[in-house]
Amino acid sequence: MELDINLLKNTAEAIVNKHQLPGMGIGVVSSKETLFIDGFGYSEIETKTKHTKNTIQRIGSITKTMTALAAMRLVEKGKLDMEAKVTDLVPSIKFNSNFSAIKVKHLFTHTSGIGEMPEKKDFSASDIKLWGDTGPFDIPNHYPNGIDVDFEPGTDWHYANHAWGILGEIVARVENDSWHNVIQKMIFDKLGMSNSYPGDDPVEGMSVGYHRDLGQDELDRMELIGDELIYGDPVDEVNIRGLKYDYVGTAAAGSVMATLEDMCTYSKALLNKSNGIISQDVFDSMLEVQYSPDPDLSIKMGLGFQVKSIFGHYAYGHNGGISGGWNTVMLLFPKLDFGLMIHLNLSSGLVEEITDEIVYALLGKPAIDIVKTPINDDQKNKILGVYRQRPGFVARSRPIRSLGRIQIIEKENNLYIQSRRGEWREATKIFKSDYGSNIYVVDDGKINPTLISINGDTLTVDRLASLDKDNRAKTW
């Protein structure tokens, strides 16, 4: 792929100005070399400290790919069995379940049946079950009442940081070492990532995290659970310095910090199928689709990696977000032999839009144009109605908070999607797409528009969460 450096720089500068970002780092690599690496804006606004390739970033959930590589190395060496029961490996963890046993393979794929809080009663305090004031949790003792399981393992998908905390505990026990030391030796030392840290203790050269004013969804939630509303004052027109530094309690799910330069090294290793951390065949197995609710939706789940289609191009990778101030993107396009790293010291839902703008500048015209066509009467009558999150409040707490119920309604001969919370809080027009027989495109104005699947009575958003039609529920 021929890289237009000037176009990339101009795009990055325009994005920083358009979205009033504190700072951003961009790295582009091939399997052989770093093609571009630079910082834009500030790692700290108040002191006007520049964002550079050496600025240290909290990479959040990209950590999961490192935990996955370490675990798969143990699998390859015969030290860990993907079919092993989790309770056999960590007997002190109890699962409150009437379902089959959770196996190691379920932890890799967010299909274990657990969610973003251990128990239903933790709804109002779910954050403190994930974030800590003083470093990582003692995983076996972090769940004194056990962890609720809401669906048969392997049959559904919902994001679960706690599952990755447990997988990290398993890796540590198998190696008879701490997870932090395992990642240091297996990943950082192996690849020469000398400015990377498995833990998230603040270090010199680290960017300051910023966020924006609370949106309606956050305000609604905080009022509902009785949290104190603490706004903070912008240090410029819009960016608010993080009021509190939270540690990732489930460290193996998201505690790594690294410079952009080191993450480019990591991306090059992944384009080379791990550079010897595991064999190429085992690495290929990590990219095989383990869960996909609809084959026509772009995002699917491998082992630790999300597998997706972006502008018609095959890609894999992961995003990472840290509450209070950081978003990170890692995308690898193996058929094009390039990878992209984006470091933002801003906690914001803007990250997907920013990513699409940068990828579009790199790729030019999409390989596949998504055609939008009107929805005919037969299709319309099948999809109109209200769709509810499936039973299981613990496992599905994230989509319940971010979307809630979804309705497909008709206004002035057009169909609209509307959610109780989130980006479709205001009704947004939808069209039929030629991308797949059950695929509809949301007319959200994005250069990479959102796709949804409606297959029978099941609506699936391109985040792998599925909702079922409730014929008794009323539209609003």
Protein language model features and the residues they cover:
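Short, glycine/proline-biased beta-turn/loop segments that scaffold the active-site neighborhood
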Residues: M82-N96, L191
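Short beta-strand micro-motifs enriched in acidic
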Residues: Q306-I310, L331-K335, I409-K411, S453
